[in-house]
Amino acid sequence: MSHIQRETSCSRPRLNSNLDVDLYGYRWARDNVGQSGATIYRLYGKPDAPELFLKHGKGSVANDVTDEMVRLNWLTAFMPLPTIKHFIRTPDDAWLLTTAIPGKTAFQVLEEYPDSGENIVDALAAFLRRLHSIPVCNCPFNSDRVFRLAQAQSRMNNGLVDA
């Protein structure tokens, strides 16, 4: 297992002034492992309040955060997902605040129970079968190979791939 510190406690960052939900009283932790380009915070420890995640994207990453919000809204008809508490989009930024889903990540389970790899793979496979059982004709999003290859080329051209 990797010994990277997966998140770091941090102070509340400077937020968009339109993020008018009550975020006071939460402790903040910044995610250190994601590679989406977005800044991700876990908000926790506020009495009688749900754990939350705040994702912030700037520039082209703001488009990715916006796309995630749209897909979460659509996918919620098919499976339990985090609740979108707040979303803000400006020309340069996107802020997505969601509830956390209770439980542990596959990484956390594997750290706690190192011999559970086969069970984790089975659980992930079951989830993917459920996701893939959604009829393609119901999906309004384009993610075909032509789109993805053009997106990959653009990312390489813009120096966003660290190969």
Where are these regions (language model features)?
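Juxta-kinase regulatory segment immediately upstream of eukaryotic protein kinase catalytic domains
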Residues: 1-28
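Short, structured coil/loop segments at alpha-helix boundaries
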Residues: 12, 16, 75-78, 113, ...
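Residues that form generic nucleotide/phosphate-binding pockets
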Residues: 18, 22, 109, 155, ...
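Exposed boundary/loop context
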Residues: 18, 27-30, 118, 152
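Solvent-exposed, flexible loop/coil residues
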Residues: 23, 105, 145
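ATP-binding pocket architecture of kinase catalytic cores
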Residues: 29-141
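Active-site catalytic-loop/activation-segment of kinase and kinase-like phosphoryl-transfer enzymes
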Residues: 126-134, 141-163
